[in-house]
Amino acid sequence: MSKNTKVNAAILIIGNEILSGRTQDTNTSTLATWLNSIGVKVNEVRIIPDQEEIIVETLNLLRKSNNYVFTTGGIGPTHDDITAQSVAKAFGLKYELHKEGYKILEAYYQPGEFNEGRQKMIWMPANADLILNPTSGAPGFSVENVFCLPGVPSIMKSMLGGLKNKIVGGDPILSYTCLLYTSPSPR
């Protein structure tokens, strides 16, 4: 893509905790601000539940109509973290242990701490590219134009710097707010 091409993205927030109101989404603002700064216009944001069929359907729709799709949430160690397997299904790829990711997490944790739950975080679509995590070790991943990041805001934000060379944007998108106060004019 040339620098003058208009580049767009969608943000897909995945998590029942967001939809129930238990957790407030701050990732949308962080991602949109960062994307605008590198010349990527956010066209759409969706918040969906931790349900495989909904994730697959939504992801397939968004990845075909946007240059990039960024997901947050659902790549952690718990039973409801199903984003990685859903992405694999959306792309028709195997869901497997990522060998490089395994080495990274094995080195990150103390002996005996790299348990089954933590190992779940390095199961990804086959041939996924890692997105390194300078905060907590567990990497995100990308497949084609889809970038999967964790839902924890501070961790997600810390990983954005590692994406700069993977995202081709346009001119930065600037916005401002203008407040205009008026008083009624006498008739």
Regions found by a protein language model. Give the residues of each.
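N-terminal amphipathic/basic leader segments beginning at the initiator methionine
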Residues: 2-8
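Short glycine-rich or small-residue beta-strand-to-loop segments that form or flank ligand, phosphate
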Residues: 12-14, 19, 68-73, 147-148
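Short glycine-rich anion-binding loops that position phosphate/pyrophosphate groups of nucleotides
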Residues: 16-17, 74-77, 153-155
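N-terminal small/polar loop signature for handling phosphorylated ligands or for N-terminal nucleophile
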Residues: 29-82, 89
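Proline/glycine-rich low-complexity loops and linkers
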Residues: 57, 82-170
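Conserved small/polar residues in nucleotide/adenosyl-binding loops
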Residues: 181-186
